[in-house]
């Protein structure tokens, strides 16, 4: 089975699990494609390419891999319907960016959308993502002062 076929099968399983758990089928979902690289400069090139392709990008975070070596990570983010074909198309667009710079694709994730939720996390404009620049206040992609807990996915 090819890498893309494996990713497509995983996408369908994730979507099926979310919907079987009761997540809202008609909601817009924040899709976060998890990207990593041991070389920060190459990771930044992937982020720039993704941004130029129309995606939002999160700030980079630094972690230690299983061998204790630094690894840098960020997310390529979009807000779309929870449809396998859309995520497949995103992966087909994102994977060549990673291959170009020898990046690591660590899958994608999203959040459960409760159909019975009263509160609106999307704010007054109805959009979760805003049009503000995702880079830090100083224009840097990586902020040395941010120390965040590792994400669990």
Swiss-Prot record:
Any matching Pfam family: RraB
Keyword Transport: no
GO molecular function, one term: endoribonuclease inhibitor activity
Annotated Gene Ontology cellular component terms: cytoplasm
This protein's record includes keyword Cytoplasm: yes
Region (Disordered): 114-153
InterPro entries, per database record: RraB (IPR016716), RraB-like_sf (IPR036701), RraB_dom (IPR009671)
Entry superkingdom: Bacteria
Subcellular location: Cytoplasm
Amino acid composition bias (Acidic residues), ranges on this chain: 115-153
Keywords linked to the UniProt accession: Cytoplasm
Subunit structure: Interacts with the C-terminal region of Rne.
Recorded family membership: Belongs to the RraB family.
Role according to the record: Globally modulates RNA abundance by binding to RNase E (Rne) and regulating its endonucleolytic activity. Can modulate Rne action in a substrate-dependent manner by altering the composition of the degradosome.
Protein name: Regulator of ribonuclease activity B
UniProt source species: Haemophilus influenzae (strain ATCC 51907 / DSM 11121 / KW20 / Rd)
